[in-house]
Amino acid sequence: MNFETIAAQAAHQIDPATGAVAPPIYLSTTFERDADGEYSRGFVYSRVDNPNRHALEECLALLEGGETGNAASAAFASGSAATAAVFQALAPGDHVIAPDDCYHGTSRMLREVFAPWGVETSFVDMTDADAVQRSVRPNTRLVWVETPSNPLLKITDIARMAAIAHSAGAACACDNTWASPMLQRPFESDADLVVHSTTKYLSGHEDVTGGAVVGREDSPFFQRVRLIQNLCGAVPSPFDCWLTLRGIRTLPVRMRAHSANAGQLARFLEDHSQVSAVHYPGLPDHPGHDIAARQMSDFGGMLSFQVAGGREAAMAVAAGVKLFVRATSLGGTQSLIEHRASIEGPDTTTPDDLLRVSVGLENADDLIGDLAQALG
């Protein structure tokens, strides 16, 4: 079955009681036992499972893993909760290799939460496979990949990272938030786990927070993540699951529009005299263009650019836009712009002349016109 059909119909059932086409929202926290004490209908308590979460998890597994029947997913209350569950599956003394430019929330989590728990991390430039290989230790248990990266849109060869991880007896996890399964499916490059902030492209409407981990059903690592989901309880509400699944139904058409708009903006910015650099893998001169073209079906809706004149000039551009919204996050219908270094704080390595853009679903000509007047 093609991806568009999976997105539109996976885990969809006509309500047997009413014939309703849209799924109901099951707000119940608890479910009735049979007379013999069994739960023949499959649900016990909504922290453990819920019909809305079950449908969302089934759909996510199909989106990332296809119809092989071997993929499963665990939904969480946020992308950070999903990420934390992967790291919680490790043990004190385990070693992680992570990108040196990974999402600042993930970097802080590893440094400030899991380092005191005894989890060691090496932050490495993952565009340099040899550097990653040199970072492997006897206690390496996880190679964490983010591609495209945030906010410089570096591209990592997922298959190469998975091979390095597996040769060391470690797992490879890929944060696929920026690409979405519409554009990139890390399992096809031998990743073991795929992580999402479903807040972003999957839900797609800036109105629900969530996360997910997708893995192989028979993987001990993934089963550990599932146990953490159950016992620690950072799960999404039934309504959050319902909203996310509703957003997924339009994911393919949205991602095509995001990608097309971003490509047009990137080409405009590349030719602008007030822009010193554009970071977008769809540009032929991007260092990771060839890898992105191989492992992605399109180049996505995120880009960043650096403004000639430094921090003050970049801040002035962000202040001068009229259509773009000055806000963090990404993947929604509205175009967002932010001065990323200000968000990440004093320890950031992000250039202070850089603006990150989440390109929305507006007309590309209108967006270009807005940036043109803001750049001057």
Whereabouts are the PLM-identified features?
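N-terminal glycine-rich, Lys/His-bearing helix-loop that initiates the first secondary-structure elements
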Residues: 1-43, 50
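Positively charged, small/polar-rich N-terminal and surface patches that mediate targeting and assembly
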Residues: 2-4, 10, 51, 322, ...
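Short, well-ordered beta-strand elements within core beta-sheets of diverse protein domains
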Residues: 244-253, 300-308, 355-360
